C-alpha cells in the first residue's frame, strides 16, 4: 500500500500513528498517511526552527525564486516525483487523487492546469497583488517605488495552511508564498493529501530549500497547533470549522462563499437574460459545484423568477453521473455516502417549509440522491424560493445547488445589501446606477459586471484577502547616503 510520510522541514518522517484512507468507490484501503501529533508539531515549529527555514528562503534572490516557480510548474505537471518510498508520475497523481476524493479525471487535470498556471505566471500574479511593486525590495528589505522610499518586514516566519479536500484548485492561493520568501506549514485535507505533497516535491526538485516545506497530516487538534504556532495562516473550512477563529487577524479565513448572480431589471426586457442561461448553469455546476466561487443563488425580479428558475433547472438537469474516466464527467461522487444522504435530507427538510419548490426534479425525473457504478451522487438541484427568508434561499452545499430568489423593486433599489455578505457577485446588467452601488458596497468581495461566470478567477487579484499584505507590513524608512559616517559626524 502507498504510504505518505510527514515532511518535517522537508525531511520525510514515518509515524507510528497512521490513518488509512479508503478508495471512494470500492471502500478498500488505498493509502496510509502518517499522522503528526501536537507535540511533534510544537517541537518542529519552535521559533528558532521557523526562523532558520525562513532564512534559507530569504537568501535566495526574488528573481531566482520566480524562476524556481516556473520550473516547479513544469515538474508538477510533467515530472515523476518522490511519494514516500515510491515515485508518482503525473498519471499516478490523477488516479490517486480521484481514488480518494471521487473527482473525475477531467476535473483533476483541469485543476492541475490552474495550479500550474499560477506557478508559471507568478511574476504577473504578484504584480497584481502588490499593485506593481518591484519585489526585489524583499532581497534588501528596502528600496524605492514611484520615487518614494519603501521598506517591508515579514509579519511571520512561516505561513500555516489548513487545507480542505474539496478541490485541488484551492492550492493556487498559497503557492505564491514561496516567491514571497515565506516557508509553508501545510496541514492537508484528510481525503486529499496528494496535491500539497506533490507541489512541495516539485519546488524541491526546482532547487527550493527543503526546510521551506513542512507537511503535517493531522487531526483537528493538530490543525489548531498549526494555526497557533504560525504567525500568519490560512484556514479553509465550513462555518462550524472556521467560526472559532473569526476576528483573529493572524488567520485568513476561507469559508462558504454564498456566491450569487444578480440579474438587473434591464436584462428582463425582450428576454435578454435567456442568452445567459448557460453562464448561470456553469457558475453553479463547474468543478462539481464544490468551490466557494460556485454560484449558490440567482437573484432576479419576482416577475421573472419562475421563468429563470425553469430555464436554468432544465440546463442543470442534463448533468448526470458518469464514470471517473469519462471526459464528459463533471459531477464528483461522495467518498462517504452518509454525507450525501445528510445533505439531501437537509434539502428535503427545507422543502417542507412552505415557499420553496425543487425545479430540477421536474426536468430530470429522477431523485436528487443517485447511485451510479457503486458510487453515491447528489445530482444538480435548483430550488425556487418565494423570498430571501426561506431556509433554502441562502444555503451552500458540496454539490451543484442554487436557489432562485425573487427580488422586490424596493430590494433591487438597495442592492447588494439585501443579498448579505457575498464572496462573488456576477451582475448581469447594463444599469450604471446598479453597477455603482455594487462598486461602492463592502458586501461584495469579488465583483464581476457583465457576462462573467462567478468561477472565472483572475489570480492576480485578491481572494478573501491579499496574501502579500497578510504576510508583510510596510514600515517608515529613511537612510542617509553613508549611515556610519553620518553617525560619526553627529557624535
List the model feature ranges, each with a label.
Residues 1-148, 318:
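N-terminal Rossmann-like NAD(P)+-binding subdomain of aldehyde/semialdehyde dehydrogenases
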Residues 2, 303, 432-433:
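Alpha-helix/helix-capping structural signal
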Residues 23-36, 62-77, 188, 205-210, ...:
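Conserved C-terminal structural/oligomerization subdomain of aldehyde/semialdehyde dehydrogenase
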Residues 27, 65, 181, 213, ...:
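Residue-level signal for inorganic ion chemistry
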Residues 41, 67, 103, 247-248, ...:
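Catalytic cores of nucleotide-enabled group-transfer and carboxylate-activating enzymes in metabolic
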Residues 71, 202-208, 230-232, 238-387, ...:
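ALDH superfamily catalytic-core signature
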Residues 131-275:
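Rossmann-like NAD(P) dinucleotide-binding subdomain of oxidoreductase/dehydrogenase enzymes
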Residues 217-227, 333-342, 459:
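Short, conserved secondary-structure transition motifs
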